[in-house]
Design a protein with these regions (language model features):
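Short, low-structural-confidence N-terminal segments
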Residues: 1-81, 186-213
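N-terminal targeting/tethering segments
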Residues: 28-158
Length: 213
C-alpha cells in the first residue's frame, strides 16, 4: 500500500524536480543571483523557463487523465506555481533551490540518483496495474522527448534538485512539528501558506544577491 501511494503522488514529485532541474549547471557570466556563494546564471534561468513551459504543456495535455473535474483548477494552479512562466518567479524558485541545496546533512548525489531511478523503475513495474501510474510514465516519456533528453541524463541532471526537494520537505516537517500543527485536507493550503511565509523569513537571513539584467 505504501508503494502504491508513493507512485500515485509521483507526478507532484516530478513537478518539483522540473522546477529545479538546472541548478547544477554552472557558468561564469551573466549572473542573475548568488545564494550563499552559489551562482545562478541567465543561461540557467532561460533553460529553466524552457523546461517549465515544456512541463506545463505536457501536464496540461494530460489534465483529464490526472485530475478529476473538481481538482482540475487546483492542479493547474499548483502547476503554475511550481513551473512559473514569469521571470522573477522563476528566479525565486532557483534561489530557493540553491538555498535548500546548501543545507547541512543533505543526502549524497549518489543517493539522490538512486532514489529518482527507483521511482522511475516503479513506474515501469506498476504501469500495467494502475492507470494513474501508466499516465505518469507517459508524461515522463513525453517530457524527455520534448526536452531531447534521456532518462539517464534526467536522473543525473536532477540529483541536486532532488536533494533540495528533500531538504525542503525536512524543513516543512520541522516547521509543522515546531508549530504543533495537524495537517488535513481542510487546512493543508493554509499550512502551506504559513510555511511559505516562514521560508521567506529564512531566505532574508541568507546571503542572497540579485543582479539587474
Amino acid at each position: 500500500m505504501k508503494k502504491i501511494l508513493k507512485i500515485s503522488v509521483f507526478a507532484a514529485v516530478v513537478i518539483c524536480l522540473s522546477a529545479f532541474l538546472l541548478i547544477g549547471c554552472q557558468s561564469n557570466k551573466n549572473l542573475v543571483a548568488t545564494v550563499n556563494g552559489t551562482d545562478i546564471t541567465e543561461e540557467q534561468l532561460q533553460e529553466q523557463l524552457k523546461t517549465n513551459a515544456v512541463f506545463k504543456e505536457v501536464i496540461s495535455s494530460h489534465i483529464d487523465d490526472i485530475a478529476t473535474p473538481d481538482y482540475k483548477e487546483i492542479t493547474l494552479k499548483r502547476l503554475d506555481e511550481q513551473c512559473p512562466a514569469d521571470r522573477d518567479k522563476a528566479i525565486k524558485k532557483l534561489v530557493e533551490t540553491a538555498y535548500f541545496l546548501g543545507m547541512d546533512n543533505s543526502i549524497s548525489k549518489d543517493e539522490a540518483e538512486k532514489q529518482i531511478k527507483q521511482q522511475l523503475d516503479d513506474l515501469d513495474a506498476y504501469s500495467g496495474q494502475y492507470d494513474n501510474v501508466k499516465v505518469n510514465r507517459e508524461i515522463m516519456n513525453e517530457f524527455f522527448e520534448k526536452l531531447s533528453t534521456t532518462e539517464e541524463q534526467y536522473i543525473k541532471d536532477s540529483a541536486d534538485s532532488y536533494i533540495a526537494m528533500v531538504n525542503r520537505q525536512r524543513m516543512y516537517n520541522k516547521f509543522i512539528e515546531d508549530e504543533n500543527l495537524v495537517v488535513d485536507e481542510n487546512n493543508s493550503d493554509e499550512v502551506i501558506n504559513e510555511f511559505e511565509q516562514y521560508l521567506d523569513e529564512q531566505l532574508k537571513k541568507a546571503d542572497i544577491v540579485y543582479y539587474n539584467s
